[in-house]
Design a protein with these regions (language model features):
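Transmembrane beta-barrel wall of Gram-negative outer-membrane proteins
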Residues: 337-362, 375-410, 426-454, 503, ...
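Structural signature of Gram-negative outer-membrane beta-barrels, strongest in the C-terminal barrel
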Residues: 489-491, 503-507, 513, 546-670, ...
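Surface-exposed extracellular loop regions of Gram-negative outer-membrane beta-barrel proteins
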Residues: 410, 458, 523-525, 603-647, ...
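Gram-negative outer-membrane beta-barrel transporters
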Residues: 567, 667-669, 691-780
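Periplasmic N-terminal accessory/gating domains of Gram-negative outer-membrane beta-barrel systems
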Residues: 172-174, 202-267, 273-306, 317, ...
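Short, acidic, small-residue-rich periplasmic hinge/interaction motif at the N-terminus
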Residues: 49, 53-56, 92, 98-141, ...
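Outer membrane beta-barrel strand-and-loop segments of large Gram-negative receptors
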Residues: 491-493, 546-550, 556, 640, ...
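Short, acidic Ser/Thr/Gly-rich low-complexity loop/linker segments typical of extracellular
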Residues: 143-154
Length: 801
């Protein structure tokens, strides 16, 4: 053997090894495209590697530093191997590389983990009755993020994947905690149990970055439990009386339920019953409100920085939500008070699916006074309210609510001196409201509510006089006079609202609506008849010149986003668009809403806001208390919409456990406000209401201080308001065109409310109110005008000043 032959041996060996390696590489290159079919659920990396190694000829090589953050869930059907690896390692800090029959796994360097986020959503309800809880607080302990339930008890919060701890709290309920690993979108419904030991509740609107209302200022949430514990006249718990005790809110006349908020008039308050406006909220000339306490679940008051979803009034929004009804068991209450009696019944129609809630109230002043009435004079007054609601749960995604309210005041006076002369009158006024609402959850981030409603307010007066006498010739003459006056407003509305949580940093609300108005401002009919021995001498019907109805159409749209900038600043930016069409006239308004909240530290917060509002309806009133003669009228070609610009700034301190301190200042500029002209009266004038009023402007400013104790056996609040409200009308008009104090301008106001709980059954409360007097203009002259006998308004007397 030659040496040369030995030299060729390594060469042949290398060639052979190379051919084998090349063949092997080609073989495994083909295996890359091997199609796999398998199903994995919550598998570990080790389990995944074993599956691939058994299904292919590859082996994995990786160090201890390589690991997966998420369990592997994958269903593959004829999927190439490289696509399987791409899918599994897409959101992991792992890279892979083929090397012959090996798959090398390496840790990605210099890259931050891709944090997946999932959404938790659901309803928060009472554990006993399944009643939804509005404004329940939800906070995540690790991320320090939170939210609140919306007006239908629904919440949605998006959090990073991993260990999660949610705390659910609500006034009067034991705090619920849920701990779990968040690895997917989760539906989590919470049933909270009542807690008679009213421990402190986490109010995240001031202490955490959560919820749309947290950014707004001038908002107060009042649970029904707080309203029932607030002292009131004659022991009747009343929604409006409780609101009167808040800073910035004035009462018209002592004891009445009228509201004058931050220098505004009563018609500038948007009062909603389950989302439907209520035009008359008073009984007994303002000493009671129309809201039966047993029917109410929660009340929210907005004095400034109104959310974009609200519009149509200048001064405030009062959102009253009623009870849905117990889905688990039947129960009820019956109570007898000094002036009223009430009954409330609720329970399941289909257990766990459908419930009802019915309440009724009636006064019995007429029954108490009847024994003391003289035989020839009869007076009667009473009022009543009826609420009914049906709540049906189609599924966790879909719910339907049907609501109805009817309330009325009735007054009658009859005189029957003898058989020849009789006269009398009766008045009735009240509301009828019917609404249907449908909640639907499109997904865990998008919630919708659709509302269709009917609303009617009517004031009706009937008077009559019968006079019968005999002539000297023996003829019997009968004179009869009767009249009917009525005014009112009827609304048909459609509204759809959406609640969207795209990311943890954004909470978006948007929607649109249509409202049809029918106004009857001033309708009078009079009938005069004369008979002689049953022979008709005259039978004439008169109508005033203002019997025409006014139809109006209102279209609205809005959008708002509550979002976070950095760790301290949160903004709420919104826009409300409204279009009002009446008498061939269009009024278009763009109303920006801006609110900001800056967290100086964990205890101190500063808020600021700007709000523009427009109002297309007016309430004409000449009395200091709520009267049925108050007239609702729309804007017209002559009467322009009211508008306002409000600026507010506030500071809040929550550093003392169980206490909250706040100070808020505001300035509001108002245009096109209405007042009756000097010397005019509502009754007895043949001219239309447009000729009785004049437009002007107003301004109000004030500062409000409040200290509130929210925890412990003794709770309550102390508030002080310093405010000023002025009006100015055209030169030559009211006060000769000079600025003058508004009739409900009260410079100083102090409210103190205290409640102490001795035990589960015994508690005591007290309230004290101090305010400076209002302003009033005293008439200097009185004139009596008697209409001609053959006039259209025969029988009316007009008293002017």
């Amino acid at each position: 053997m030659k040496i040369i032959s030995q030299d060729y041996l390594p060469v042949r060996t290398f060639i052979l090894i190379g051919m084998v390696l090349l063949t092997t590489t080609q073989t495994y290159a083909q295996n890359i495209n091997t199609r796999l079919s398998f199903t994995l659920k919550n598998a570990t990396l080790k389990e995944f590697v074993k599956l691939i190694e058994n299904s292919t000829g590859y082996s994995f090589i990786y160090g201890e530093e390589v690991g997966i953050r998420h369990k592997i869930t994958l269903k593959a059907k004829e999927m190439p191997l490289h696509e399987v690896l791409d899918t599994v390692f897409k959101d992991e800090l792992i890279s892979y590389q083929f090397s012959g029959r090996y798959i090398l796994l390496k840790e990605k360097k210099g890259q931050k983990p891709v944090s997946r986020k999932f959404t938790i959503s659901g309803y928060v309800t009472d554990g006993t009755s399944s009643e939804t809880l509005i404004g329940s607080n939800i906070i995540e302990s690790h991320q320090h993020q939170g939210t609140t339930t919306n007006p239908y008890g629904f919440y949605s919060i998006t959090l990073p994947e991993g260990e999660t701890e949610l705390r659910f709290s609500y006034l009067g309920y034991a705090t619920e905690t849920r701990k779990f690993t968040l690895s997917k979108d989760t539906l989590l419904n919470i049933r909270m149990q009542g807690n008679t030991q009213l421990e402190e509740v986490i109010i995240i609107s001031d202490k955490a970055e959560a919820g749309a209302i947290a950014t707004q200022m001038g908002a107060v949430e009042i649970p029904m439990a707080q309203i029932k514990n607030t002292p009131s006249i004659l022991g009747e718990a009343d929604v409006m009386k409780t609101i009167q005790l808040m800073p910035g809110v004035q009462a018209g006349v002592d004891g009445s339920a009228g509201l004058y908020i931050r220098g505004g008039s009563p018609d500038q308050n948007l009062i909603l019953l389950d989302g439907t406006p209520v035009y008359n909220v008073d009984h007994l000339f303002g000493f009671f409100s129309v809201f039966t306490p047993e029917a109410v679940k929660k009340v929210t008051l907005f004095k400034s920085s109104f959310p974009a979803r609200f519009g149509g009034r200048l001064s405030s929004v009062i959102d009253v939500r009623t009870n849905d009804g117990d889905m688990q068991k039947y129960h009820g209450t019956f109570s007898i008070g000094l002036l009223t009696s009430k009954i409330n019944l609720e329970g399941p129609i289909i257990k766990g699916k459908t419930s009802f809630n019915i309440s009724a109230r009636r006064s019995y002043l007429d029954l108490l006074a009847k024994p003391f009435m003289p035989d020839d004079e009869k007076y009667s007054y009473y009022f009543y309210d009826m609420n009914a609601k049906i709540n049906h749960k189609f599924s966790d995604r879909s719910r339907m609510f049907l609501s109805a309210y009817h309330g009325k005041d009735h007054f009658a006076a009859d005189y029957d001196g003898n058989t020849d002369f009789k006269d009398g009158s009766n008045m009735g006024w009240g509301n009828t409201i019917v609404s249907a609402r449908w909640n639907y959850i499109f997904n865990n981030r998008l919630f919708s509510n659709t509302t269709v409603s009917y609303n009617n307010y009517l004031f009706d007066v009937n008077t009559y006089t019968n006079n019968q006498y005999s002539t000297g010739a023996g003829a019997i003459i009968l004179n009869r006079y009767s009249s009917n006056y009525h005014s009112g407003i009827t609304d048909w509305s459609y509204q759809i609202d959406f609640d969207y949580n795209p990311t943890p940093a954004h909470h978006i609300k948007f929607g649109t609506g249509y409202l049809f108005h029918r106004f009857q401002p001033d309708v009078t009919t009079s009938v005069i008849s004369d008979k002689t021995d049953n022979r008709i001498d005259r039978d004439t019907t008169y109508h005033n010149a203002n019997n025409s109805r006014i139809h109006a159409h209102e279209v609205t749209a809005y959008a708002e986003d509550n979002f976070k900038i950095g760790s301290r600043l949160r903004l709420n930016l919104g826009l409300h668009l409204s279009l009002f069409h009446v008498q061939d006239q269009n009024y278009l308004s763009l109303q920006p809403r801006i609110s900001a909240r800056y967290q100086l530290n964990k205890d101190i917060t500063i808020k600021a806001s700007y709000t523009k509002m427009n109002q297309y309806v007016h309430l004409l009133s000449s009395m200091p208390i709520a009267m049925p003669t108050d007239l609702w009228v729309p804007v017209t070609k002559k009467i322009k919409p009211m508008r306002s610009h409000q600026y507010a700034l506030g500071g809040y301190y929550t550093g003392i456990n169980g206490w909250e301190f706040s100070v808020e200042g505001y300035y509001k500029d108002m245009r096109n406000v209405l007042e009756y002209k000097d010397g005019v009266s509502f009754f007895g004038s043949s001219s239309g209401w447009e000729n009785k009023v004049e437009m002007g402007k107003g301004r109000s400013a004030g500062i409000e201080f409040m200290a509130q104790k929210t925890a412990g056996k003794t709770t309550g609040w102390l508030s002080y308001t310093l405010s000023k409200s002025d009006r100015k009308f055209t030169k030559g008009g009211i006060n000769n065109g000079e600025w003058f104090p508004y009739k409900y301008d009260r410079r100083h106001s102090i409210n103190l409310t205290i409640n102490h709980k001795f035990s589960d059954r015994i508690d005591i409360g007290a309230s004290w109110v101090f305010y400076t007097g209002g302003t009033s203009t005293i008439p200097e002259e009185k004139t009596t005008v008697i209409r001609p006998h053959n006039g259209a308004n025969n029988g009316f007397l007009w008293y002017g000043t």
